[in-house]
């Protein structure tokens, strides 16, 4: 039953459909097609475009998948874990910004290096900002 239906589609219905399509004899004939004829051609052209894409897809360049990469590239690499301790009482400024992207040349203080890092990688890292509470 299933194979008979499939055979009917390929032997009878598909050839009949292709015969009814308004395919012009020349390229100039495409200009003379009416809107209704273009609408009748649309499904056929869509299937051809899909088959063409599926045929060339294996040859298209692959998008590089972003791997998890190291964040800290150069600061205190000899230590197994980098920890900076700052006593809050020692904060003489009303506000201080500390680096969280590991790109700062004045680490642990933020110098805005995360802006370039974010632009290049699409990341959204920012500094840790400490403020004195106003009493």
From Swiss-Prot:
Q: What keywords are annotated for this sequence in UniProt?
A: 2Fe-2S, Autophagy, Endoplasmic reticulum, Iron, Iron-sulfur, Membrane, Metal-binding, Mitochondrion, Mitochondrion outer membrane, Transmembrane, Transmembrane helix
Membrane topology, record value: Single-pass membrane protein
Q: Which segments sit on the Cytoplasmic face? A: 61-135
SMART domains, A to Z: ZnF_CDGSH
Principal localisation:
endoplasmic reticulum
Q: Which GO terms describe its biological process?
A: autophagy of mitochondrion; regulation of autophagy
Q: How is the cofactor bound?
A: Binds 1 [2Fe-2S] cluster.
Where in or outside the cell?
Answer: Endoplasmic reticulum membrane; Mitochondrion outer membrane
* TM stretches of this protein: 38-60
Quaternary state and partners of this protein?
Homodimer.
Task: Identify this protein by name.
Answer: CDGSH iron-sulfur domain-containing protein 2B
């Amino acid at each position: 039953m299933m194979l008979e239906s499939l055979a009917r589609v390929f032997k009878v219905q598909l050839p009949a459909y292709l015969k009814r399509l308004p395919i012009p004899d020349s390229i100039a004939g495409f200009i003379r097609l009416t809107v209704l004829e273009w609408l009748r051609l649309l499904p056929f052209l869509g299937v051809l475009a899909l088959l063409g894409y599926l045929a060339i897809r294996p040859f298209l360049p692959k998008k590089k998948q972003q791997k998890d990469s190291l964040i800290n590239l150069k600061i205190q690499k000899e230590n197994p874990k980098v920890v900076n301790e700052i006593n809050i009482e020692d904060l003489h400024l009303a506000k201080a910004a500390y680096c969280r992207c590991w790109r700062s040349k004045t680490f642990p203080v933020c110098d805005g290096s995360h802006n370039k890092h974010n632009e290049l990688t699409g990341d959204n890292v920012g500094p840790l900002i400490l403020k004195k509470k106003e009493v």
